[in-house]
């Protein structure tokens, strides 16, 4: 039965490890807009026949509201098949499979990555961690039992950029968790600076990833792009024009270094519609940067299904 459950779970993961409305415990207080058409099963580059058989056992629906304009297919881009060994490890599940999600306040708030974590635990087993209650006030580290299953750690810092985590102590902390997969979610705060420079941003990503690779040589990586944000004072707020460049730089880095990327920014509408889509569904908080619980639930749902 556990083996079958793993196949079912893999099909769910194969549809976004990365950004959430499938289970009753995740329902928002306010109704989420109607869902659009079902997605075709996501093809993971290099998937085994055994993995694909499992994917056919479950139907996964697109959780983007049908009225989200200029949205793209919710997939992880991984032409080099860099995540295939990780997905195989999920399928085998002979011990704990450890995921460390690092990022800015979107990760620090815990809601979006927590939904991803709970869904993965549902699909692959929660026996690897002790039951816990996670809120904004608690830490986001899971506590292992030693049993097989998903171990999902959340390490977010308010205002963080990739430079924030390019620190020996933070790298040591991440390495001490023995990650199989590291999810890297930055870009919002880099793009918020008026002095943003694309080339400097790429160099900063490279420094962080270089440190992580050296400290965690067995880990695989998934980069994500930011969801979009506004800048300026409340009554004169405009869509941040630098986010499109920041998202492009993250995606370029991933492609150049044969890493997987989940391009949330363009999936939810990109330059023309990402912020407008979030806004018309009242998913932004008043600051135009952070999101309501509904907004983070949707991101978490997307993240889980893209995987």
Residue locations for each model-derived region?
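Conserved SGNH/GDSL esterase-like catalytic core that processes O-acyl groups on lipids
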Residues: 98-101, 106-203, 207, 214
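Stable alpha-helical elements in mature extracytoplasmic
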Residues: 79-86, 108, 112, 116, ...
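Coil residues (strongly favoring Ser/Thr
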Residues: 31, 63, 71-75, 79, ...
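Eukaryotic extended interaction platforms
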Residues: 38, 42-47, 52-56, 60-69
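A short, charged/proline- and glycine-enriched loop
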Residues: 92-97
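Bacterial Sec-dependent N-terminal signal peptides
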Residues: 1-39
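Catalytic cores of extracellular degradative/oxidative enzymes
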Residues: 165, 180-182, 191-255, 274, ...
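Catalytic His-Asp segment of secreted/periplasmic serine-dependent ester chemistry enzymes
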Residues: 30, 226-306
